[in-house]
């Protein structure tokens, strides 16, 4: 066999399909399959090479190419299945059997083999719908008269799904202990093993009961939400009967009661549990339909326009139709370069409770996220703030983390320039944070009328139950224009010094974390938090108080025995772990041209529909920061459609920090077979001073052609922490 070193896919295929071969050479066929699995773009290159060989005028070469294709489908996995399942490759196969193209010049043996492969794939790969469409089209055109027989030895058997793991019986420590006890000849050990088995069975029964209860709760919530949503769609104040109104009130009460149940379920669910997404989606739908009921039936304007309506719900959400609190992930939503940068004004001395921004508000009726962009006018304040209620749930549960952006080296009016010198890299991960803006039409506002700013853009998640559109007459519009930002959080109480503005110290951040937890407790117990004033934090430090405004509390709390203000300081301190200066990445910036690649293999973070994201690891750490891993994020497009509006956000646990530097672009051109794939690069910095195992979550938003997509994922295949700086 030829040496594998230096062999390319083309050389492997040329040897495997050589017309001079007397028989199929499986040595080279398997070598070709292995090379596909090794190469980053192996499947994309392989299908192009195979399509050319299959259309060869030499029958023996074409038959060998089809044998290679069949072997690849069995050995190269889903990546190759996705490429073969695209019309680009299927059209090449159809040309072989269609009399309009090559059908009259291709032998019957080759055509029969192609039809046989297509039919076997329709049975073995039902998820590849395009293969089935192509085969049925051939049948409709009469090219395929009947389904060919498929020998058992040539049937494509997909890889079986992984065996579902039982967390109780797959516990490594218990399994080792049980095996040790069972091997023992001591009767006491056998008795202990018997007790251990019984306890494991009980744990498994409790787990099954918990899962059953969760499924029942989710089903009940979804049924109530669906029924209430449909009744609200057909509600008319003049023509709806009292019975309908009573039924809607009963459904509304049920939905309110289920909020806390869902919040409890989410808090009890592990981060890596697949059911967490279903719980959050159900909570998202529940919050949306509750807000719709309050708006349509009770006439409330949600989130800030009527002060009695701005109390956050029991889950800590502040919903607002097509606007909401951004998920506290990588802060990559860039403000318009025309946004003014306001200098902090002198503020009165701070009190024991730091000032927190109230929930955001909307200047129009609540609407579903799926329709907000289509219905809203093109102005920046109405289209760019279509944010996700699911993001709010992630934010409140502490499952999402911020990753601040780095300043660009070039100055000017670039949107990234506004992120320079921000203190947000010291903010806490996984702690509930209200990164939002709001306004109040009342005279007690702490800010003068805000200057008109350009809002930030965030791709919305589709709404499962879009909220009904409320007539404009039922809405009292706000007078201000506000900006939401997933960018750096502003200084809450800036101090006045001769040298210039100064951002709050870490102790204030700790008190913020403690108050965040108090707010969460207050929302769950009795909904005591009622903002009486509103202000708008922007992406840069903005004045929160005019110089002449006296200090006064923003958040009145009830003083009953259950009030969170009576909780012990020890409880309050649990809001956030102590953060040291070594976590900060604000001053760390790594130019792309200075990065040296390492020998570590890249990790595929996302690969779907021809859009792929890879993590490449740098050889060295930034100077003076051996705890920081430098990752180059490569985004590739092999799809025939352009990919636009690409935004990548990242999150890590509290003991780490992550920062995404500005990407080289936000659009990828369509794939062309005569040109290399379009690519975007973005540098990501990951600080891990505690040397813990890295678990990074990401949120990816993009538009493939005209279709908007939002993807969530997790990556944990990082190099060992001990090898950072010497990869």
UniProtKB/Swiss-Prot annotation:
Residues 171-298 form the GAT domain. It holds the Pfam family GGA_N-GAT. It is a peripheral membrane protein. One of its GO terms (cellular component) is protein-containing complex. Its main location: Golgi. InterPro entries: Clathrin_a/b/g-adaptin_app_Ig (IPR008152), Clathrin_app_Ig-like_sf (IPR013041), ENTH_VHS (IPR008942), GAE_dom (IPR008153), GAT_dom (IPR004152), GAT_GGA3 (IPR044111), GAT_sf (IPR038425), GGA1-3 (IPR027422). Residues 343-363 have a biased composition (Pro residues). Residues 598-719 form the GAE domain. Keywords: Endosome, Golgi apparatus, Membrane, Phosphoprotein, Protein transport, Transport, Ubl conjugation. SMART domains: Alpha_adaptinC2, VHS. Plays a role in protein sorting and trafficking between the trans-Golgi network (TGN) and endosomes. Mediates the ARF-dependent recruitment of clathrin to the TGN and binds ubiquitinated proteins and membrane cargo molecules with a cytosolic acidic cluster-dileucine (DXXLL) motif. Mediates export of the GPCR receptor ADRA2B to the cell surface. Involved in BACE1 transport and sorting as well as regulation of BACE1 protein levels. Regulates retrograde transport of BACE1 from endosomes to the trans-Golgi network via interaction through the VHS motif and dependent of BACE1 phosphorylation. Monomer. Interacts with GGA1 and GGA2. Binds to clathrin and activated ARFs, such as ARF1, ARF5 and ARF6. Binds RABEP1 and RABGEF1. Interacts with the membrane proteins M6PR/CD-MPR and IGF2R/CI-MPR and the accessory proteins SYNRG, EPN4, NECAP1, NECAP2 and AFTPH/aftiphilin. Interacts with TSG101 and UBC. Interacts with ADRA2B. Interacts with NTRK1; the interaction is independent of NTRK1 activation and ubiquitination. Interacts (via VHS domain) with BACE1 (via DXXLL motif). PANTHER family: ADP-RIBOSYLATION FACTOR-BINDING PROTEIN GGA3 (PTHR45905:SF3), GOLGI-LOCALIZED, GAMMA-ADAPTIN EAR CONTAINING, ARF BINDING PROTEIN (PTHR45905). Belongs to the GGA protein family. This is ADP-ribosylation factor-binding protein GGA3. The gene is Gga3.
């Amino acid at each position: 066999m030829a040496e594998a070193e230096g062999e390319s896919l083309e050389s492997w295929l040329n040897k495997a399909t050589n017309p001079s071969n007397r028989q199929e050479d499986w040595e080279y066929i398997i070598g070709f399959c292995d090379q596909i699995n090794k190469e980053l773009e192996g499947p994309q290159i392989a299908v192009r090479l195979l399509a050319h060989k299959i259309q060869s005028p030499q029958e023996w070469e074409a038959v060998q190419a089809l044998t290679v294709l069949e072997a690849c489908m069995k050995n190269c996995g889903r990546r190759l299945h996705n490429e073969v399942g695209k019309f680009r490759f299927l059209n090449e196969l159809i040309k072989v059997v269609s009399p309009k193209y090559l059908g009259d010049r291709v032998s019957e043996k080759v055509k029969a083999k192609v039809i046989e492969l297509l039919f076997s794939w329709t049975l073995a790969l039902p998820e590849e719908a395009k293969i089935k469409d192509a085969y049925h089209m051939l049948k409709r055109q009469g090219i395929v008269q009947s389904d060919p027989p498929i020998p058992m030895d040539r049937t494509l058997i997909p890889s079986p799904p992984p065996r579902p793991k039982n967390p109780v019986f797959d516990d490594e420590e218990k399994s080792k202990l049980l095996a040790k006890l069972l091997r023992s000849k001591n009767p006491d050990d056998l008795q202990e093993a018997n007790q251990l088995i019984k306890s494991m069975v009980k744990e498994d029964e409790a787990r099954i009961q918990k899962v059953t209860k969760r499924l029942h709760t989710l089903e009940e919530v979804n049924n109530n939400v669906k029924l209430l949503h449909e009744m609200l769609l057909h509600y008319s104040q003049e023509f709806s009967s009292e019975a309908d109104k009573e039924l809607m009130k009963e459904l509304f009460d049920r939905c309110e009661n289920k909020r806390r149940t869902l919040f409890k379920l989410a808090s009890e669910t592990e981060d890596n549990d697949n059911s967490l997404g279903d719980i959050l989606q159900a909570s998202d739908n529940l919050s949306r339909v509750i807000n719709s009921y309050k708006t349509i039936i009770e006439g409330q304007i949600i989130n800030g326009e009527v002060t009695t309506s701005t109390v956050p719900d029991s889950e800590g959400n502040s919903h607002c139709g097509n606007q909401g609190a951004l998920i506290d992930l990588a802060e990559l939503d860039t403000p318009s370069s025309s946004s003014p940068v306001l200098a902090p004004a002198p503020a009165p001395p701070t009190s024991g409770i730091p000032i927190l921004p109230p929930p955001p508000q909307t200047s129009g009726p609540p609407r579903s996220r799926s329709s907000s962009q289509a219905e809203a006018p093109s102005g920046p304040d109405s289209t760019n703030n279509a944010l996700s209620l699911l993001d709010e749930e992630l934010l409140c549960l502490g499952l999402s983390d911020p990753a601040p952006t780095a300043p660009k080296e070039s100055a000017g009016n670039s949107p990234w320039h506004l992120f320079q010198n921000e203190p947000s890299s010291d903010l806490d991960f996984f702690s509930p944070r209200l990164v939002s803006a709001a306004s109040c039409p009342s005279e007690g506002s702490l800010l003068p009328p805000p200057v008109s700013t350009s809002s930030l853009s965030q791709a919305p998640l589709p709404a499962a139950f879009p909220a009904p559109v409320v007539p404009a007459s039922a809405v009292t519009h706000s007078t201000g224009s506000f900006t939401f930002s997933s960018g750096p959080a502003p200084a809450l109480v800036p101090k006045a010094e001769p040298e210039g503005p100064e951002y709050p110290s870490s102790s204030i951040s700790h008190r913020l974390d403690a108050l965040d937890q108090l707010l969460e407790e207050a929302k769950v117990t009795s909904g005591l938090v009622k903002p009486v004033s509103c202000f708008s934090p922007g992406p840069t430090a903005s004045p929160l108080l005019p110089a002449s405004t006296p200090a006064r509390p923003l958040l009145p709390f009830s003083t009953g025995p259950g009030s969170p203000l009576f909780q012990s300081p020890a409880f309050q301190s649990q809001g956030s772990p102590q953060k040291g200066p070594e976590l900060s990445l604000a001053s760390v910036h790594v130019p792309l041209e200075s990065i040296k690649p390492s020998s570590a293999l890249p990790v595929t973070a996302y690969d779907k529909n021809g859009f792929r994201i890879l993590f490449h690891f740098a050889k060295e750490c930034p100077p003076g920061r051996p705890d920081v891993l430098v990752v180059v994020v490569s985004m590739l497009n092999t799809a025939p459609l352009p990919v636009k509006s690409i935004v990548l956000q990242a999150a890590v646990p509290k003991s780490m920090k992550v920062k995404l530097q500005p990407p080289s672009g936000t659009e990828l051109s369509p794939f062309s077979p005569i040109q290399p794939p379009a690519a975007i690069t973005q540098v990501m910095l990951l600080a891990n001073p505690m040397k813990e195992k890295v678990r990074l979550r990401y949120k990816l938003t993009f538009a493939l052609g005209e279709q908007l997509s939002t993807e969530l994922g997790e990556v944990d295949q990082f190099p060992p922490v001990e090898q950072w700086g010497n990869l």
